[in-house]
Amino acid sequence: MLPDDGDVFPPYGATESLPVACLPGREIVAKTWAETEKGAGVCVGLPVPDIEVKVIRISDDAIATFSDDLELEDGEIGEIAVRGPMVTEAYFADEPNTALSKIRDGDFIWHRMGDVGWRDREGRLWFCGRKSHRVLVDGATMFTVPCEKIFDAHPAVYRSALVGPRGLPTLCVELEPGQRSADWPEIERQLRHIAQAHPQTNRISRFVRHPSFPVDIRHNAKIGREKLAKWVEAKGLS
C-alpha cells in the first residue's frame, strides 16, 4: 500500500537503453489518461537527463547514417530513436541486427527502439506500440496502442489486441472475469459503434472474443500478438 501522498515513477526504456523517459504516475492519471482513452497512445514522459530522443520516419530497412530529413515534426507518429551514455552501440557478434537497430551519427550511435510514438509540444513522449505490430490497410497505418486503449475503456473489456492477418484489421478481445458468453453479441455491437466514432479505429473490420490472451513467460503481460494473428487465421476469421 502506498501512503496517500505516495507516487510511482514507471520508466520507459529497453534492455539496450534504460531508462529513456519517465512520468509520475499521478500525472499520467490526472493529465494524460483521458487522452490515452481517446486514442493518443500512452504518455511515457520527458526524456531523462543525458538522453536524446528523436522521432524518425518509419522504415523496416537499415539506416546507415543519420540525416536531418529523417526527423518528424512534433505530433507525427514515427520510430523512436535514442542516444546517450546508457545506450548500447552494438549487439555482440550480430551484425545483421546491429545494422537494423543502430544509426551512425558522427561519433555517436542512435538506437532504434523498435517502438513507434510521437512527441507533444511539451516534449513528452507518447508510446504507440511496437513498429512490427503496426497494421497496414488501404494505404493507412494503424498502430496498436492508440486503437486498443479506446476499447479497453469499455467496462466489459479486460484487454484487447489489434492484429492484421492477411491485411484485415482485427480486434481480439478478452472480456473481464464474470462476463457471460451470451453477453458477447451486445458487447461486440457496442465495440463496433465505438470503432466508428474514432479515426484510429474505424477501419477495424473484425471483432473476435478470445478466452485468454497468450502472454510472455517473463513479464506475464506482453501480449503474444503473433500467436493471436495465427489463431484468427486458424479459426477462419480473416
Q: Which stretches of residues belong to each language-model region?
A:
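Conserved C-terminal "lid"/linker of ANL adenylate-forming enzymes
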Residues: V135, A161-L162, L171, R192-S238
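Conserved ATP-binding/catalytic segment of the ANL
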Residues: A62, L70-T141, A153
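Gly/Ser/Thr-rich phosphate-binding loop
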Residues: M1-G39, E52
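C-terminal boundary motif of the adenylate-forming
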Residues: T65-S67, G114-V116, A153-P177
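Short Gly/Pro-enriched turn/cap motifs at secondary-structure boundaries
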Residues: K38-P47, L70-E71, D107-F108
